[in-house]
């Protein structure tokens, strides 16, 4: 209507761009902002929002140019400084990001977003105390800011403050990242304190397959108290968890009737189990295996491995199904794996479940190493059988994916290659147990040293086994 009344209105086109952006129509939003600039070339807010859209499209250089144009027209625009900081951070230019956030905060010291985003960059740099301080400043301004609570929880967990970190993690449902995945029941959540005697509890998965497996290690603690335990999880996990926890009712996740259900007394998201059993979780590093694939299938895979040649038999995985920009530093290339792959006298087995064919060919062509792949195994969906294969292997080498959680769960020796500055570099989100050895790299380091150390470990184990 505004454009019909005044078709040369820069403000009207700008507002239209904002509406289109909110609706996810990014190209149309840029077109509307550009029309606003036709009528007012010095419209700093339009340049700023073009930058936001370009960043949403992962066009970071173009976004930075748009933010710089906005700042040239409006030098005291705290929002544009914060936005360009976000773009620098997405590029990995962390120092530039910090400079931009500090400039934003010098103009608007009460920006919870700038404090929170700067804290996240501090965490990526491994400056966890600075991250905790920045998150705390954001929360002093707005105590209900869910994103800051969520980020603070990761920082606290990563410095070993388990109790406080787990308390903060309960705020995740007010974070923009998690709010849409929250389930809504008429029954109140279990608070972790009230007795579960003669009570039925529903535990529901909330994140990835690996997280569900990791948190399932707490199920014996629940079943020792509750009359009945229902677990709703990813459908492909149902066979593995049902076999491993026969006294738990394991079902595929179903959200269709949440507010009408009456088959339990209290629900709880699985990510809250560690908080409910904090003292027991602190001893988890010494816990036994908790996943139990079929022994007949373990023997099948062991015999199949033996038929392929001499051991040790080493499974490898180097990336995830989710390779978003934020997660990329968690993952390695096949070239990074070369210190392990060139070990003599080792039979390598592929445990990668997505996008592996080209990588296996590259390993064969560049290193002359065969990584055996079982075409008859659905690595992505048949997790009960994958667990049996993992249990048959001698060693598993993996970055962050479902694989090290399965291998840790079945008790196979696991060499876990981890990005130290990852928000998830803690016991809540990492595989732990007596069979897990963690090898960390810093943001500013390559993976080479990590896989070199893993290779040395495997070589020593191979020597020990041969002597035995």
Predicted regions and their residues:
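Alpha-helical solenoid repeat scaffolds of the TPR/TPR-like class and their adjacent stem/linker regions
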Residues: 1-396, 400-468
């Amino acid at each position: 209507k505004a454009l019909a009344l005044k078709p040369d209105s820069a403000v009207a086109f700008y507002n239209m761009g904002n509406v289109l952006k909110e609706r996810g129509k990014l190209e149309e939003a840029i077109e509307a902002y550009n029309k606003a600039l036709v009528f007012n070339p010095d419209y700093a807010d339009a340049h700023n929002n073009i930058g936001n859209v370009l960043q949403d499209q992962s066009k970071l250089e173009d976004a930075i140019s748009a933010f710089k144009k906005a700042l040239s027209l409006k030098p005291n625009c705290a929002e544009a400084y914060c936005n360009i900081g976000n773009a620098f951070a997405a590029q990995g230019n962390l120092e530039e990001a910090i400079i931009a956030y500090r400039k934003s905060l010098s103009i608007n010291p009460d920006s919870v977003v700038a404090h929170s985003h700067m804290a996240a960059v501090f965490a990526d740099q491994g400056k966890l105390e600075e991250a905790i301080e920045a998150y705390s400043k954001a929360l002093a301004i707005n105590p209900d800011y869910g994103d800051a609570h969520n980020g603070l929880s990761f920082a606290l967990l990563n410095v070993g403050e388990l109790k406080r970190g787990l308390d903060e993690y309960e705020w995740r449902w007010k974070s923009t990242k998690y709010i849409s995945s929250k389930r809504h029941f008429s029954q109140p959540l279990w608070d972790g304190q009230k007795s579960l005697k003669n009570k039925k509890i529903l535990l529901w998965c909330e994140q990835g397959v690996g997280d569900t497996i990791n948190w399932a290690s707490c199920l014996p603690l629940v079943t020792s108290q509750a009359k009945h335990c229902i677990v709703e999880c990813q459908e492909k996990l149902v066979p593995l968890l049902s076999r491993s926890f026969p006294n738990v009712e394991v079902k595929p996740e179903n959200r269709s009737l949440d507010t009408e259900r009456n088959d339990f007394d209290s629900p709880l998201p699985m990510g809250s189990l560690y908080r409910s059993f904090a003292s027991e979780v602190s001893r988890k590093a010494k816990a036994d295996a908790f996943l139990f694939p079929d022994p007949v299938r373990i023997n099948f895979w062991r015999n199949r491995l033996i038929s392929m040649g001499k051991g040790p038999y080493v499974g490898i995985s180097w990336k995830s199904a989710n390779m978003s920009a934020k997660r990329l530093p968690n993952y390695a290339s096949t070239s990074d794996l070369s210190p392990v792959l060139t070990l003599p006298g080792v039979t390598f087995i592929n445990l990668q479940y997505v996008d592996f064919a080209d990588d296996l060919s590259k390993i064969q062509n560049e290193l002359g190493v065969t990584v055996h792949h079982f075409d008859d195994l659905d690595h992505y969906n048949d997790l009960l059988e994958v667990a049996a294969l993992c249990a048959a292997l001698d060693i598993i080498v993996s970055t962050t994916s479902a694989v090290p959680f399965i291998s840790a769960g079945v008790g196979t020796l696991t060499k876990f290659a981890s990005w130290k500055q990852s928000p998830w570099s803690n016991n809540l989100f990492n595989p732990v147990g007596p069979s897990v050895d963690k090898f960390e790299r810093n943001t500013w380091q390559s993976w080479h040293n990590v896989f070199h150390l893993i290779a040395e470990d495997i070589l020593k184990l191979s020597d020990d086994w041969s002597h035995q």
